[in-house]
């Protein structure tokens, strides 16, 4: 290394590039999760492909400049916004493929069962090139069936799973034990990631 430090590249294992850099548009004054979700929901209808590309490219440049060589980004879609952000993130994955490895997670932020049409979009996202299947059982009902469905999709496409899991203030309604049991039952050990587990 000629007197310099040589280390493997760093990994950003959980980011939402399609929703990054929006705090200046509508601030989260309370700093709470509830307001963050509310503010983001208000802003999402204003996102265009050009807007997402500009913001996500800025984020990519920041990550690359700080030594990140592998990124897993959750990219959402639903019937009201379509694939605006998701398609843009897939485009950036291709554009930056010689610089950074990007894994795109098909992420149903608004739930699958409570948002009709999202289940079909999950399959479409996998066909479009998603690298992993996302889940958010705490924001859907019934939560265990949400977990079952995303496993079904992951198995169909032989992809890993990445869950936003039990992101709440209390322990009521937690599904992490069910998720662990399901992971073992399906032989998916080592292929399931969990984030936001705060209960």
List each model region and its residues.
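Histidine/acidic residue-rich metal-binding segments in metalloenzymes
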Residues: 84-98, 115-199
């Amino acid at each position: 290394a000629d007197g310099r430090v040589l280390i493997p590249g760093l990994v950003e294992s959980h980011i939402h590039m399609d929703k990054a850099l929006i705090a200046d548009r509508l601030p989260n004054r309370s700093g709470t999760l509830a307001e963050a979700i509310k503010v983001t929901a208000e802003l999402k209808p204003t996102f265009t492909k050009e807007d997402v590309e500009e913001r996500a490219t800025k984020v990519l440049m920041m990550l690359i400049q700080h030594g990140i060589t592998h990124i897993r980004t959750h990219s959402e879609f639903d019937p009201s916004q379509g694939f605006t952000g998701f398609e843009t993130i897939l485009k950036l994955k291709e554009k930056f493929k010689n610089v950074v490895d990007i894994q795109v997670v098909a992420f149903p932020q608004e739930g699958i069962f409570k948002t009709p049409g999202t289940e079909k979009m999950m399959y479409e996202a996998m066909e479009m090139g998603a690298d992993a299947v996302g889940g958010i059982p705490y924001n859907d009902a019934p939560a265990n069936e949400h977990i079952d469905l995303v496993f079904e999709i992951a198995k169909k496409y032989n992809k890993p799973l990445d869950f936003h899991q039990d992101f709440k203030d209390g322990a009521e309604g937690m599904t992490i034990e069910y998720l662990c049991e399901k992971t073992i039952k399906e032989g998916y050990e080592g292929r399931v990631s969990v984030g936001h587990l705060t209960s």
